[in-house]
């Protein structure tokens, strides 16, 4: 769980999110040829933070990718990102 912990710590530090979910989905891809077999290659993150206010979806993804540059250059093969402001995370009325 080293990479998962690192992802969680870095995102928490960078964005001080109201909600942070880090889900290791590597087990869903274990049989894929591109899977390194480490058990920490595919992740999904949900980050709800004020830091995304006024930013486009592309800019938000770039922000997350920049924070996790080291992990993405290494053993992380795939990262699904959902980055929202607190207001965007509220259910539609």
Where are these regions (language model features)?
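C-terminal structural segments of small proteins and small subunits
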Residues: 58-93
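N-terminal first-folded block
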Residues: 1-36
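A short, structured beta-strand/loop element
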Residues: 32-49
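Solvent-exposed beta-strand sheet faces enriched in polar/charged residues
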Residues: 23, 46-48, 80-84
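A generic structural signal for short beta-strands and their flanking turns/coil linkers
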Residues: 16-18, 39-43, 75-79
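Histidine-centered active-site/metal-ligand motif
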Residues: 29-32, 42, 61, 77
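Short, conserved charged micro-motifs
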Residues: 52-57
């Amino acid at each position: 769980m080293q990479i998962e912990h690192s992802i969680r710590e870095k995102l928490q530090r960078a964005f001080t999110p109201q909600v942070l979910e880090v889900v290791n989905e590597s087990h869903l891809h274990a049989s894929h040829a591109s899977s390194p077999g480490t058990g920490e290659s595919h992740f999904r993150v949900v980050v709800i933070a004020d830091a995304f206010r006024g930013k486009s979806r592309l800019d938000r993804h770039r922000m997350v990718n920049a924070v996790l540059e080291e992990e993405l250059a290494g053993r992380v093969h795939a990262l699904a990102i959902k980055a929202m402001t607190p207001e965007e995370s509220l259910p539609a009325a």
